Amino acid sequence: MAFKEVVRVAVTGGKGQIAYNFLFALAHGDVFGVDRGVDLRIYDVPGTERALSGVRMELDDGAYPLLHRLRVTTSLNDAFDGIDAAFLIGAVPRGPGMERGDLLKQNGQIFSLQGAALNTAAKRDAKIFVVGNPVNTNCWIAMKHAPRLHRKNFHAMLRLDQNRMHSMLAHRAEVPLEEVSRVVIWGNHSAKQVPDFTQARISGKPAAEVIGDRDWLENILVHSVQNRGSAVIEARGKSSAASASRALAEAARSIFCPKSDEWFSSGVCSDHNPYGIPEDLIFGFPCRMLPSGDYEIIPGLPWEPFIRNKIQISLDEIAQEKASVSSL
Protein backbone atom coordinates (compact mmCIF):
# COMPACT_ATOMS: atom_id res chain seq x y z
CA MET A 1 0.00 0.00 0.00
CA ALA A 2 1.37 3.43 -0.96
CA PHE A 3 1.36 5.98 1.86
CA LYS A 4 1.57 9.76 1.75
CA GLU A 5 4.07 9.33 4.58
CA VAL A 6 4.92 6.95 7.40
CA VAL A 7 4.55 8.39 10.90
CA ARG A 8 6.82 7.07 13.62
CA VAL A 9 4.74 6.72 16.78
CA ALA A 10 5.43 5.63 20.36
CA VAL A 11 2.74 4.64 22.86
CA THR A 12 3.62 4.10 26.53
CA GLY A 13 1.62 2.11 29.05
CA GLY A 14 1.13 -0.42 26.30
CA LYS A 15 -0.48 -3.15 28.39
CA GLY A 16 -3.04 -0.82 30.00
CA GLN A 17 -6.70 -0.44 29.08
CA ILE A 18 -6.51 3.04 27.54
CA ALA A 19 -3.58 2.02 25.35
CA TYR A 20 -5.29 -1.25 24.45
CA ASN A 21 -8.30 0.65 23.10
CA PHE A 22 -6.20 3.37 21.50
CA LEU A 23 -3.79 1.13 19.61
CA PHE A 24 -6.49 -0.38 17.43
CA ALA A 25 -7.92 3.05 16.60
CA LEU A 26 -4.42 4.14 15.68
CA ALA A 27 -3.87 1.14 13.42
CA HIS A 28 -7.28 1.69 11.79
CA GLY A 29 -6.45 5.24 10.69
CA ASP A 30 -8.55 7.10 13.25
CA VAL A 31 -5.60 9.22 14.39
CA PHE A 32 -3.41 10.10 11.40
CA GLY A 33 -5.89 9.40 8.62
CA VAL A 34 -6.11 6.60 6.09
CA ASP A 35 -3.28 7.85 3.85
CA ARG A 36 -0.48 7.68 6.43
CA GLY A 37 1.29 4.52 7.44
CA VAL A 38 2.27 3.97 11.07
CA ASP A 39 5.64 2.75 12.35
CA LEU A 40 4.43 1.81 15.84
CA ARG A 41 6.50 1.23 18.96
CA ILE A 42 4.62 0.06 22.06
CA TYR A 43 6.39 0.57 25.38
CA ASP A 44 5.80 -0.62 28.91
CA VAL A 45 8.03 -1.18 31.91
CA PRO A 46 10.31 -4.22 32.28
CA GLY A 47 8.35 -7.24 33.46
CA THR A 48 5.46 -6.64 31.06
CA GLU A 49 7.01 -8.41 28.08
CA ARG A 50 4.48 -11.23 28.00
CA ALA A 51 1.49 -8.89 28.09
CA LEU A 52 3.06 -6.73 25.38
CA SER A 53 3.56 -9.79 23.20
CA GLY A 54 -0.17 -10.51 23.50
CA VAL A 55 -1.02 -6.97 22.40
CA ARG A 56 1.32 -7.37 19.45
CA MET A 57 -0.32 -10.66 18.48
CA GLU A 58 -3.74 -9.02 18.39
CA LEU A 59 -2.52 -6.13 16.27
CA ASP A 60 -0.86 -8.58 13.90
CA ASP A 61 -4.05 -10.64 13.76
CA GLY A 62 -6.04 -7.51 12.88
CA ALA A 63 -4.15 -7.34 9.56
CA TYR A 64 -4.22 -3.53 9.48
CA PRO A 65 -2.97 -2.20 6.12
CA LEU A 66 -1.80 1.05 7.74
CA LEU A 67 0.42 -0.72 10.26
CA HIS A 68 3.69 -0.35 8.37
CA ARG A 69 5.89 -1.64 11.18
CA LEU A 70 5.27 -2.83 14.74
CA ARG A 71 7.47 -3.58 17.68
CA VAL A 72 7.12 -3.81 21.45
CA THR A 73 9.85 -2.76 23.84
CA THR A 74 10.73 -2.07 27.46
CA SER A 75 13.39 0.49 26.47
CA LEU A 76 12.34 4.15 26.36
CA ASN A 77 15.20 5.12 24.04
CA ASP A 78 14.22 2.35 21.65
CA ALA A 79 10.56 3.40 21.76
CA PHE A 80 11.30 7.09 21.18
CA ASP A 81 14.03 6.74 18.55
CA GLY A 82 13.28 9.20 15.74
CA ILE A 83 9.58 9.46 16.53
CA ASP A 84 7.17 12.03 15.10
CA ALA A 85 4.61 11.60 17.89
CA ALA A 86 4.42 10.06 21.35
CA PHE A 87 1.36 9.20 23.41
CA LEU A 88 2.40 9.02 27.06
CA ILE A 89 -0.41 7.00 28.58
CA GLY A 90 1.29 4.96 31.29
CA ALA A 91 1.25 6.39 34.83
CA VAL A 92 0.86 5.30 38.44
CA PRO A 93 -2.86 5.33 39.31
CA ARG A 94 -4.03 6.89 42.53
CA GLY A 95 -4.55 4.13 45.09
CA PRO A 96 -6.68 3.98 48.25
CA GLY A 97 -5.48 6.47 50.82
CA MET A 98 -2.86 7.96 48.51
CA GLU A 99 -2.41 11.71 48.83
CA ARG A 100 -2.31 13.75 45.62
CA GLY A 101 1.17 14.94 46.57
CA ASP A 102 2.43 11.35 46.71
CA LEU A 103 0.88 10.65 43.32
CA LEU A 104 2.55 13.73 41.86
CA LYS A 105 5.97 12.68 43.11
CA GLN A 106 5.69 9.06 41.94
CA ASN A 107 4.55 10.08 38.48
CA GLY A 108 7.06 12.89 38.47
CA GLN A 109 9.85 10.34 38.48
CA ILE A 110 8.23 8.44 35.59
CA PHE A 111 7.76 11.51 33.42
CA SER A 112 11.22 12.84 34.25
CA LEU A 113 12.68 9.67 32.74
CA GLN A 114 10.34 9.79 29.76
CA GLY A 115 11.14 13.44 29.13
CA ALA A 116 14.86 12.75 29.25
CA ALA A 117 14.46 9.86 26.81
CA LEU A 118 12.43 12.05 24.46
CA ASN A 119 15.16 14.67 24.66
CA THR A 120 17.75 12.08 23.65
CA ALA A 121 15.90 10.13 20.99
CA ALA A 122 12.84 11.89 19.52
CA LYS A 123 12.75 14.27 16.58
CA ARG A 124 13.02 17.88 17.67
CA ASP A 125 9.58 18.69 16.25
CA ALA A 126 7.87 15.58 17.65
CA LYS A 127 4.41 16.14 19.07
CA ILE A 128 3.90 14.78 22.57
CA PHE A 129 0.46 13.91 23.96
CA VAL A 130 0.32 13.20 27.69
CA VAL A 131 -2.59 11.23 29.14
CA GLY A 132 -1.33 9.87 32.47
CA ASN A 133 -2.64 11.83 35.44
CA PRO A 134 -2.12 14.35 36.96
CA VAL A 135 -1.81 15.20 33.32
CA ASN A 136 -0.99 18.93 33.33
CA THR A 137 1.86 18.50 35.77
CA ASN A 138 3.11 15.26 34.21
CA CYS A 139 3.19 17.04 30.86
CA TRP A 140 5.12 19.95 32.40
CA ILE A 141 7.67 17.56 33.92
CA ALA A 142 8.20 15.79 30.59
CA MET A 143 8.55 19.13 28.81
CA LYS A 144 11.12 20.42 31.31
CA HIS A 145 13.22 17.28 30.86
CA ALA A 146 13.14 17.55 27.06
CA PRO A 147 14.55 21.03 26.36
CA ARG A 148 15.65 20.01 22.86
CA LEU A 149 12.01 19.60 21.80
CA HIS A 150 9.70 22.51 21.01
CA ARG A 151 7.70 23.42 24.13
CA LYS A 152 4.64 24.25 22.04
CA ASN A 153 4.39 20.62 20.92
CA PHE A 154 3.57 19.23 24.36
CA HIS A 155 -0.13 18.59 24.95
CA ALA A 156 -1.95 17.49 28.11
CA MET A 157 -5.20 15.80 27.18
CA LEU A 158 -8.32 17.80 27.99
CA ARG A 159 -10.31 16.38 25.09
CA LEU A 160 -12.21 13.92 27.27
CA ASP A 161 -13.46 16.82 29.39
CA GLN A 162 -14.41 18.69 26.22
CA ASN A 163 -16.28 15.66 24.90
CA ARG A 164 -18.13 15.21 28.16
CA MET A 165 -19.30 18.81 28.12
CA HIS A 166 -20.17 18.60 24.43
CA SER A 167 -22.38 15.57 25.02
CA MET A 168 -24.09 17.03 28.09
CA LEU A 169 -24.97 20.24 26.26
CA ALA A 170 -26.37 18.31 23.30
CA HIS A 171 -28.50 16.11 25.56
CA ARG A 172 -29.82 19.08 27.52
CA ALA A 173 -30.71 21.01 24.36
CA GLU A 174 -32.05 17.86 22.67
CA VAL A 175 -30.00 18.46 19.54
CA PRO A 176 -27.54 16.30 17.57
CA LEU A 177 -23.92 16.52 18.67
CA GLU A 178 -22.91 18.32 15.48
CA GLU A 179 -25.11 21.27 16.47
CA VAL A 180 -22.84 22.01 19.46
CA SER A 181 -19.57 23.88 18.90
CA ARG A 182 -16.95 26.03 20.62
CA VAL A 183 -16.80 23.87 23.73
CA VAL A 184 -13.96 25.19 25.88
CA ILE A 185 -12.13 23.77 28.90
CA TRP A 186 -9.69 26.06 30.74
CA GLY A 187 -7.03 25.18 33.28
CA ASN A 188 -6.25 21.89 34.96
CA HIS A 189 -7.55 18.41 34.20
CA SER A 190 -8.96 17.91 37.68
CA ALA A 191 -12.08 18.62 39.67
CA LYS A 192 -11.05 22.29 39.39
CA GLN A 193 -11.11 22.42 35.61
CA VAL A 194 -13.25 25.16 34.06
CA PRO A 195 -15.93 24.04 31.57
CA ASP A 196 -16.74 27.40 29.95
CA PHE A 197 -20.33 27.27 28.74
CA THR A 198 -20.23 31.01 27.96
CA GLN A 199 -18.23 30.33 24.77
CA ALA A 200 -20.29 27.34 23.60
CA ARG A 201 -22.71 27.57 20.69
CA ILE A 202 -25.76 25.44 19.94
CA SER A 203 -27.04 25.70 16.37
CA GLY A 204 -24.93 28.85 16.08
CA LYS A 205 -26.51 30.57 19.08
CA PRO A 206 -25.03 31.08 22.57
CA ALA A 207 -25.58 27.91 24.60
CA ALA A 208 -26.83 29.92 27.58
CA GLU A 209 -29.52 31.46 25.37
CA VAL A 210 -30.62 28.09 23.98
CA ILE A 211 -30.55 26.26 27.33
CA GLY A 212 -32.23 29.13 29.16
CA ASP A 213 -31.30 27.82 32.61
CA ARG A 214 -28.32 29.60 34.15
CA ASP A 215 -28.55 27.62 37.38
CA TRP A 216 -28.23 24.34 35.49
CA LEU A 217 -25.24 25.64 33.53
CA GLU A 218 -23.36 27.05 36.53
CA ASN A 219 -24.09 24.30 39.02
CA ILE A 220 -25.18 21.06 37.36
CA LEU A 221 -23.21 21.18 34.10
CA VAL A 222 -19.96 22.50 35.53
CA HIS A 223 -20.02 20.14 38.52
CA SER A 224 -20.93 17.15 36.34
CA VAL A 225 -18.06 17.73 33.91
CA GLN A 226 -15.59 18.35 36.72
CA ASN A 227 -16.52 15.14 38.50
CA ARG A 228 -17.41 12.84 35.61
CA GLY A 229 -14.27 10.75 35.96
CA SER A 230 -15.07 9.97 39.59
CA ALA A 231 -18.66 9.17 38.67
CA VAL A 232 -17.51 6.64 36.08
CA ILE A 233 -15.22 4.95 38.60
CA GLU A 234 -18.00 4.81 41.17
CA ALA A 235 -20.45 3.33 38.66
CA ARG A 236 -18.29 0.69 36.97
CA GLY A 237 -15.42 0.23 39.40
CA LYS A 238 -12.83 1.25 36.83
CA SER A 239 -11.64 4.50 35.33
CA SER A 240 -12.62 5.69 31.86
CA ALA A 241 -10.80 3.73 29.17
CA ALA A 242 -12.79 3.55 25.92
CA SER A 243 -13.92 7.18 26.13
CA ALA A 244 -10.40 8.30 27.07
CA SER A 245 -8.98 6.39 24.11
CA ARG A 246 -11.45 8.02 21.73
CA ALA A 247 -10.67 11.44 23.17
CA LEU A 248 -6.95 10.87 22.66
CA ALA A 249 -7.50 9.84 19.05
CA GLU A 250 -9.59 12.96 18.45
CA ALA A 251 -7.05 15.20 20.19
CA ALA A 252 -4.27 14.00 17.90
CA ARG A 253 -6.49 14.05 14.81
CA SER A 254 -7.36 17.71 15.45
CA ILE A 255 -3.66 18.47 15.02
CA PHE A 256 -2.61 15.99 12.31
CA CYS A 257 -5.86 16.08 10.28
CA PRO A 258 -7.37 19.46 11.20
CA LYS A 259 -10.82 20.65 10.22
CA SER A 260 -11.39 24.22 9.11
CA ASP A 261 -11.73 26.57 12.12
CA GLU A 262 -12.25 23.68 14.56
CA TRP A 263 -11.89 24.68 18.21
CA PHE A 264 -10.27 22.17 20.53
CA SER A 265 -9.17 22.38 24.15
CA SER A 266 -5.67 21.26 25.08
CA GLY A 267 -3.27 21.71 27.95
CA VAL A 268 -0.37 23.55 26.31
CA CYS A 269 2.61 25.62 27.36
CA SER A 270 1.41 29.00 28.61
CA ASP A 271 4.37 30.95 27.20
CA HIS A 272 3.23 34.13 25.41
CA ASN A 273 -0.47 33.34 25.86
CA PRO A 274 -3.01 36.14 25.26
CA TYR A 275 -4.81 35.79 28.62
CA GLY A 276 -2.18 36.79 31.14
CA ILE A 277 -1.71 33.28 32.52
CA PRO A 278 1.83 33.05 33.98
CA GLU A 279 4.40 31.49 31.68
CA ASP A 280 6.02 28.07 32.08
CA LEU A 281 2.84 26.21 32.99
CA ILE A 282 0.78 23.59 31.17
CA PHE A 283 -2.65 25.20 31.13
CA GLY A 284 -5.85 24.34 29.30
CA PHE A 285 -6.69 26.78 26.50
CA PRO A 286 -9.00 26.80 23.48
CA CYS A 287 -6.89 26.26 20.37
CA ARG A 288 -7.24 26.00 16.61
CA MET A 289 -4.90 24.98 13.82
CA LEU A 290 -3.32 27.43 11.39
CA PRO A 291 -2.51 26.84 7.71
CA SER A 292 1.16 26.69 8.71
CA GLY A 293 0.53 23.48 10.64
CA ASP A 294 1.00 25.15 14.02
CA TYR A 295 -1.82 25.80 16.46
CA GLU A 296 -2.75 29.07 18.08
CA ILE A 297 -4.42 29.80 21.38
CA ILE A 298 -7.67 31.46 20.37
CA PRO A 299 -7.38 35.08 21.54
CA GLY A 300 -9.91 37.62 22.72
CA LEU A 301 -12.50 35.44 24.46
CA PRO A 302 -14.22 37.33 27.29
CA TRP A 303 -14.32 35.91 30.81
CA GLU A 304 -17.46 36.48 32.80
CA PRO A 305 -16.81 36.93 36.55
CA PHE A 306 -18.12 33.40 37.24
CA ILE A 307 -15.62 31.92 34.77
CA ARG A 308 -12.75 34.23 35.80
CA ASN A 309 -13.03 33.18 39.43
CA LYS A 310 -12.94 29.49 38.54
CA ILE A 311 -9.97 30.01 36.23
CA GLN A 312 -8.05 31.58 39.11
CA ILE A 313 -8.83 28.57 41.32
CA SER A 314 -7.63 26.18 38.61
CA LEU A 315 -4.52 28.29 38.00
CA ASP A 316 -3.66 28.24 41.70
CA GLU A 317 -3.94 24.44 41.72
CA ILE A 318 -1.61 24.08 38.72
CA ALA A 319 0.92 26.44 40.31
CA GLN A 320 0.81 24.47 43.56
CA GLU A 321 1.33 21.18 41.72
CA LYS A 322 4.27 22.65 39.82
CA ALA A 323 5.84 23.89 43.06
CA SER A 324 5.49 20.46 44.66
CA VAL A 325 7.50 18.73 41.90
CA SER A 326 9.97 21.48 40.97
CA SER A 327 12.77 19.63 42.77
CA LEU A 328 12.44 16.84 40.21
From Swiss-Prot:
UniProt key word Oxidoreductase: yes
Q: Name one GO molecular function term.
A: L-malate dehydrogenase (NAD+) activity
Q: Name one Pfam family in it.
A: Ldh_1_N
Q: Which reaction does it catalyse?
A: (S)-malate + NAD(+) = oxaloacetate + NADH + H(+)
Q: Which UniProt keywords apply?
A: NAD, Oxidoreductase, Tricarboxylic acid cycle
Report the Gene3D superfamilies cross-referenced here: Lactate dehydrogenase/glycoside hydrolase, family 4, C-terminal, NAD(P)-binding Rossmann-like Domain
Q: Which residues form a coiled coil?
A: none
Provide the family line. Belongs to the LDH/MDH superfamily. MDH type 2 family.
Q: What is this protein called?
A: Malate dehydrogenase
Q: Tell me the lineage of the source organism.
A: Bacteria, Pseudomonadati, Chlamydiota, Chlamydiia, Chlamydiales
